[in-house]
């Protein structure tokens, strides 16, 4: 480890292999907390490279609990959190809606980072079991087209870094790792990041990790596609990254103020999500979900463009199909596979 630290102290970047080695030691609990604090701080001050982020992600995936990966195509929709704007749970709600649209979704999530309730806080409130075994989760994915993978169930080693992360009280490499370490390893992915300068590096990281199709987005201050302004996109397709901007108009949607998708406490967010899933969401809530599910339909080849994809999502929302799916998931999640 000290060899890796000396490289960083000289202002140089670590290779992917070196970072993989360093973070392998971290998640195995072999690194003294003071040394770990130095590692995270040195990386942060230098600025983490895509190779370093990929190496750390590979280390965590290598130590993760196995998930029985299916041979069909499936996706994840996830944000880093940490945008500080406390909006409704767009990615969690979108995951349920995407499944209601016929996609297969294995969503990786954790307790809250940015909103008052993260994906796990919301699922808990909806009666969906968080600590499903990998076999149970796979059963839900096969039968219903959706499962939720609760990060601590798969990445137990990350607990070794928790005291240091809490003591540092600043963002570190761990803040961007969560969305990159889905143990199911989805075939395509929509990932939101909390800062515009992360869009390109995280897309490069996903490409380095072998993702074939995906989008990394930052929406005017949010770690998701915005309905209140433009969204910066880095699209991964056929081994290449293309960068562009999209606006609500590209989806055929109105523009709304960000206050229209303000979130609340876990119970309030559960009520908001329940209303959206049942076809009783506000126009702004529905638009936020449509904008974030539409790219997944496009990536899956189930829509020709963003406008027709968003229209399909709005139709599924109006049908209340997603509420039915959430209720079935709550029941199935408590049954043995």
UniProtKB/Swiss-Prot annotation:
Lineage of the species this protein comes from: Bacteria, Pseudomonadati, Pseudomonadota, Gammaproteobacteria, Aeromonadales
Q: Does the keyword Amino-acid biosynthesis apply?
A: yes
UniProt-annotated binding residues for 5-phospho-alpha-D-ribose 1-diphosphate: 79, 82-83, 87, 89-92, 107-115, 119
One Gene Ontology cellular component term attached to this UniProt record is: cytosol
Q: Which Gene3D superfamilies match?
A: Nucleoside phosphorylase/phosphoribosyltransferase catalytic domain (3.40.1030.10), Transferase, Pyrimidine Nucleoside Phosphorylase, Chain C (1.20.970.10)
Copy out the cofactor comment. Answer: Binds 2 magnesium ions per monomer.
Leading EC class:
transferase
Q: Which cofactor does it need?
A: Mg(2+)
Tell me any Pfam family this protein matches.
Answer: Glycos_transf_3
Q: What is the similarity comment for this entry?
A: Belongs to the anthranilate phosphoribosyltransferase family.
Q: Where on this chain does Mg(2+) 2 bind?
A: 223-224
Designated name of the protein: Anthranilate phosphoribosyltransferase
Signal peptide residues are: none
Hey, which pathway is this one from? Amino-acid biosynthesis; L-tryptophan biosynthesis; L-tryptophan from chorismate: step 2/5
GO molecular function list: anthranilate phosphoribosyltransferase activity; magnesium ion binding
Amino-acid biosynthesis as a keyword of this entry, yes or no, is: yes
What organism is the protein native to? Aeromonas salmonicida (strain A449)
Q: Which PANTHER family match?
A: ANTHRANILATE PHOSPHORIBOSYLTRANSFERASE
Enumerate the residues binding anthranilate 2.
165
Q: What Enzyme Commission number(s) appear in the record?
A: 2.4.2.18
Q: How does it assemble?
A: Homodimer.
């Amino acid at each position: 480890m000290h060899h890796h630290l000396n490289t960083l102290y000289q202002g140089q970047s670590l290779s992917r292999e070196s970072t993989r080695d360093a973070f392998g030691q971290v998640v195995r609990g072999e690194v003294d907390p003071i040394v770990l604090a130095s590692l995270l701080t040195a990386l942060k001050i230098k600025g983490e490279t895509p190779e370093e982020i990929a190496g750390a992600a590979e280390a965590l995936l290598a130590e993760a609990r196995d998930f029985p990966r299916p041979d069909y195509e499936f996706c994840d929709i996830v944000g880093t959190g940490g945008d500080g704007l406390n909006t409704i749970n767009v990615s969690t709600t979108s995951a349920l809606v995407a499944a209601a649209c016929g996609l297969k979704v294995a969503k990786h999530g954790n307790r809250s980072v940015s909103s008052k309730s993260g994906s796990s806080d919301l699922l808990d409130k909806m009666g969906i079991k968080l600590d499903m075994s990998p076999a149970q989760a796979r059963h839900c994915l096969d039968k219903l087209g959706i499962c939720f993978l609760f990060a601590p169930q798969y990445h137990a080693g990350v607990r070794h870094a928790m005291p240091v992360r809490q003591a540092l009280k600043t963002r570190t490499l761990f803040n961007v790792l969560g969305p990159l370490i889905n143990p199911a390893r989805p075939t395509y992915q929509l990932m939101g990041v909390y800062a515009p300068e992360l869009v390109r590096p995280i897309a490069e990281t996903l490409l380095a990790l072998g993702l074939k199709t995906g989008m990394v987005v930052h929406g005017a201050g949010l770690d998701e596609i915005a309905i209140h302004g433009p969204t910066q996109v880095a699209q991964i397709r056929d081994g290449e990254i293309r960068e562009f901007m999209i606006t609500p108009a590209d989806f055929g949607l109105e523009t709304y103020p960000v206050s229209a998708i303000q979130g609340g406490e876990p119970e309030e967010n559960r009520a908001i999500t329940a209303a959206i899933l049942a076809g009783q969401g506000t126009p702004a809530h529905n638009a936020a979900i449509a904008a974030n599910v539409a790219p997944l339909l496009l990536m899956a080849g189930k829509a020709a463009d963003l406008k027709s994809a968003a229209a399909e999502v709005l139709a599924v929302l109006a049908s209340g199909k997603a509420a039915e799916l959430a209720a079935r998931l709550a029941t199935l999640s408590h049954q043995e596979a």
